[in-house]
Curated annotation (Swiss-Prot):
Keywords: Cytoplasm
Coiled-coil region list: none
UniProt-recorded name of the protein: UPF0298 protein Sez_1612
GO cellular component: cytoplasm
The organism of origin for this protein: Streptococcus equi subsp. zooepidemicus (strain MGCS10565)
Annotated disulfide bonds: none
Domain of life according to the entry: Bacteria
Source species taxonomy: Bacteria, Bacillati, Bacillota, Bacilli, Lactobacillales
Main location as per UniProt: cytoplasm
Length: 94
């Protein structure tokens, strides 16, 4: 049966957009911002350490960040509607 592969996103900041094609061999390209010069790629979580090290060594890469999407709690329990707070009485000044 099909096993779901654990994936993680990497945000890769580049010096020049022309080098984006060179990074695509490391994972699946999800988004390329030409204006801000960064890429979002997805890789297998088990290969993250070695690919992160390889990508960081490339001369045209400015910075690599690991996505924090896995750290976000997605369990929403209860009512998401917030009740307005009642106004508090101000103490009298005398």
């Amino acid at each position: 049966m099909f096993q779901k592969q654990q994936r993680i996103g990497l945000v890769i900041y580049l010096y020049y957009n022309r080098d984006a094609r060179k990074v695509m061999k490391y994972g699946d390209l999800y988004y390329h911002s030409r204006r801000s010069r960064y890429l979002v790629i997805y890789i297998n979580k088990e290969d993250m350490e070695e690919k992160l090290k390889d990508i960081s060594r490339l001369t045209f890469v400015k910075e690599v960040k690991v996505s924090a999407f896995d750290d976000i709690d997605c369990d929403f329990v209860g009512n998401l509607h917030r009740e307005p707070l009642e106004p508090q009485a101000l103490p009298e000044q005398g």
